[in-house]
Amino acid sequence: MDYSIKQQQKRKIAGFHMVGPWEQTVKQGFEQLMMWVDGHHIQPLEWVAVYYDNPDEVPAEKLRCDTVVTVPDDFVIPANSEGVILTEVAAGDYAIATARVENYDFGTPWHSFFNSLLQDNHYQIAPKPCFERYLNDGNADGYWDIEMFVPVQNKAG
């Protein structure tokens, strides 16, 4: 899979922290997020899912993710926003790849991306969260165009 390495600025994010199998929690989290964004007239900059764990190492019921929107630095969580978190995605070097997801199969492009990164001679995966940015409304279009971001660092030696 083709990818590029680019410096990313930190992103301030607001939304919901979810724990459990991603195929359930990501969908549920975005349903909650859409209701919150619509109900509070939030103007999201981006729609993002942040992934904190390696599903090959962490049991499905303990997988953590955030379903969030990026917001301006001066954003304040409005009243009556039960369960909403405000945090950030760290700045740094990220490997970035794009993919089209059909039939809700988000796993295949991520696996392909990780397999490509593991063969990189110059960069290795850094121990920070990964995230994906949605470039369209998959519920309306029937597919999702996404950008996948994996934190990287120079290989030692």
UniProtKB/Swiss-Prot annotation:
Q: Which InterPro entries match?
A: AraC_E-bd, DNA_gyrase_inhibitor, DNA_gyrase_inhibitor_GyrI, GyrI-like, Reg_factor_effector_dom_sf
Where is it located?
Cytoplasm
Q: Does the keyword Cell membrane apply?
A: no
- Check the record and name the SMART domains matching this protein: AraC_E_bind
Presence of keyword Magnesium: no
Q: Tell me the GO molecular function terms.
A: DNA topoisomerase type II (double strand cut, ATP-hydrolyzing) inhibitor activity
For this record, the Gene Ontology CC terms, alphabetical, are: cytoplasm
Give the keywords, sorted: Cytoplasm, Stress response
Cited HAMAP family: DNA_gyrase_inhibitor
Q: What does this protein do?
A: Inhibits the supercoiling activity of DNA gyrase. Acts by inhibiting DNA gyrase at an early step, prior to (or at the step of) binding of DNA by the gyrase. It protects cells against toxins that target DNA gyrase, by inhibiting activity of these toxins and reducing the formation of lethal double-strand breaks in the cell.
**What quaternary arrangement does the UniProt entry report?**
Interacts with DNA gyrase.
Q: Which family does it belong to?
A: Belongs to the DNA gyrase inhibitor family.
Listed name of the protein:
DNA gyrase inhibitor
Record organism: Enterobacter sp. (strain 638)
